[in-house]
Amino acid sequence: ATCDLLSGTGANHSACAAHCLLRGNRGGYCNGKAVCVCRN
């Protein structure tokens, strides 16, 4: 959801990364399908 909601602002990757960090991951990014992908 973070990738779609903020895609127009450029903040979508930051929101995705923050979401992943909160889940204990090392960050994340939005893929080509606007899905937030967390790094392990």
UniProtKB/Swiss-Prot annotation:
Induction: By bacterial infection.
Signal peptide (from-to): none
InterPro entries: Defensin_insect (IPR017982), Defensin_invertebrate/fungal (IPR001542), Scorpion_toxin-like_sf (IPR036574)
Keywords: Antibiotic, Antimicrobial, Defensin, Disulfide bond, Fungicide, Immunity, Innate immunity, Secreted
Disulfide bond keyword on record: yes
Domain of life: Eukaryota
Presence of keyword Secreted: yes
Major subcellular site: secreted
Cell location: Secreted
Disulfides per UniProt: 3-30, 16-36, 20-38
BP term (GO), one: humoral immune response
GO cellular component annotations of the record: extracellular space
Entry-linked Gene3D superfamilies: Knottin, scorpion toxin-like
Family per similarity comment: Belongs to the invertebrate defensin family. Type 1 subfamily.
Function recorded in the entry: Antimicrobial peptide mostly active against Gram-positive bacteria. Active against Gram-positive bacterium M.luteus and also against fungus N.crassa. Has no activity against Gram-negative bacterium E.coli. Active against M.luteus and, weakly, against E.coli.
Misc. remarks from the entry: At least 3 isoforms with masses ranging from 4032 kDa to 4114 kDa seem to exist.
Name listed for the protein in its UniProt record: Defensin
Protein's organism: Calliphora vicina
